[in-house]
Amino acid sequence: MIFTLLSTLPVLIITTELDYSELVHSAELVSSSSYIHHKTNKKPDNCTRDTDIIDRLLNGTGYNKFRIPQEEGMTVVVEIWIQAITSIDELTNDFDMDIYITETWLDPALNFQTMTPCKGNLSLNHQVLDRLWTPNSCFINSKVAQIHNSPFRSVFLMLFPNGTVMVNYRVRVKGPCSLDLSNFPLDLQKCSLIYESFNYNRQEVEMRWSDAEHPVFNLSKIMLPDFDLFEIQTERRQEPYPAGMWDELHVTIIFERRFIWYFMQAYLPTYLTIFISWISFSLGSRAIPARTMLGVNSLLAIVFSFGNIMRNLPRVSYIKGIDVWMLVSMTFIFCSLLELAIVGFMVRDETVAKKKQQKKISGNISREESPHGIISERRFMFPPGCSESSKSLSSCTSGWTPERIDSISSVMFPFSFFVFNIIYWFYYIHRKEIIKQNLINRVDG
């Protein structure tokens, strides 16, 4: 991969007509493309070979890599190419990615225009770079950052005749993420890196992003299981330290969570579980054991689903979007069990009252002998609309029967859940759009 990238570097510089005199404004540079256009198959007479140039620059001129090349200060131009973002870990709040970092600066002590070079530029490795002055830049907020060594140290150095130095590193970096799960799973997450010179303040080394339209860009499409890449933001800040002011180059990568997986794993099973719990309203007031088993199993299913989702998320002290969904869903199932308890209580009360009524009725039956010898019975009178075989006196007088409660519940529960869905989805989708708009306005500003 590194050979493919390095082979494309001259093409990138030619096609974009990159002018280092614009990138590094601290000194007047000659466009490096003029050197790359130079045909190496037509070498000038008595040209100087690469090894001789390096030997003269580093050994014959008293080059000192510990001294800043320009007393008035250096300007280092930075560009980052993202090769891959491999993972985002929400439990540890970090992300991993492979990147190429390109740094460009002007070192007048490395000017070899007068040496009649055989090539328009010199392509060198990290061994030569170790002998040159460098800005000692690093990611100051990274958890881990290391240059790839597969199979050799992945450092590319290009030296131009006018003293322009371009260094490219292939780095694996683990950076921090500031996770806000309040809108989870309809959320956006930000991960950031801060790049600066570790040893030099801005009076000695000025760090700035490339003038390219996108100083940080992707070499290929980023594919992650849970996230899509939404936006890459770059910013240059000046931060005070006890030793002076430092230039910091901030890059913020914003990810948008893929919602479909959570809908399939959390929301869809919850819908089905709640719909199943409503079946108990149609089983009748006498099927208490079956309705109890159905309600309890529904509650256990939704609790298990909730625990399975929360196991992969960090513990936070605020309420997440999915917490609201699961808690309200469990409340609906719990309320269906409360409705079942009320119906069961009324059925039991009805049964006890029926037995008492039957005893009372049997005691109130009087037998009277008629003139024709026929025995007639006088029974206890019930209120109008009630029968002694099906209703207790309390349910008759109040109008609330188990059947009526089930009938009302079969309408009110779906209606209430429908209203909750409208409020829930409108709020969290609207909130997500507000977050997006704020991020876009920040980029435009």
From Swiss-Prot:
An individual GO BP term: chloride transmembrane transport
Disulfide pairings: C177-C191
Annotated Gene Ontology cellular component terms: chloride channel complex; plasma membrane
Transmembrane segments: 259-279, 287-307, 327-347, 408-428
Glycan-modified residues: N46, N59, N121, N162, N218
Membrane among keywords: yes
Cytoplasmic compartment segments: 280-286, 348-407
Disruption phenotype: Grossly normal movement.
Localization in the cell: Cell membrane
InterPro entries: GABAA/Glycine_rcpt (IPR006028), Neur_chan_lig-bd (IPR006202), Neur_chan_lig-bd_sf (IPR036734), Neur_channel (IPR006201), Neuro-gated_channel_TM_sf (IPR036719), Neuro_actylchol_rec (IPR038050), Neurotrans-gated_channel_TM (IPR006029), Neurotransmitter_ion_chnl_CS (IPR018000)
UniProt note on tissues of expression: Expressed in RIA, RIG, PHA and AIZ glutamatergic neurons, URX and RIH cholinergic neurons, and in male-specific MCM neurons.
Spans within the Extracellular topological domain: 27-258, 308-326, 429-445
CDD domains noted in UniProt: LGIC_ECD_GABAAR, LGIC_TM_anion
Membrane topology, from the record: Multi-pass membrane protein
Signal peptide feature range: 1-26
One Pfam short name: Neur_chan_memb
Keyword set, alphabetical order: Cell membrane, Chloride, Chloride channel, Disulfide bond, Glycoprotein, Ion channel, Ion transport, Ligand-gated ion channel, Membrane, Signal, Transmembrane, Transmembrane helix, Transport
GO MF term (any one): extracellular ligand-gated monoatomic ion channel activity
Predominant localisation class: membrane
Subunit structure, as described in the record: Homopentamer (in vitro). May interact with either acc-3 or acc-4; the interactions do not result in significant heteropentameric ion channel activity.
Family under the similarity heading: Belongs to the ligand-gated ion channel (TC 1.A.9) family.
Functional note: Acetylcholine-gated chloride channel subunit. Currents in channels are triggered in response to acetylcholine. Channel properties may be modulated by the formation of homomeric and heteromeric channels.
Name listed for the protein in its UniProt record: Acetylcholine-gated chloride channel subunit acc-2
Organism: Caenorhabditis elegans
Name of the encoding gene: acc-2
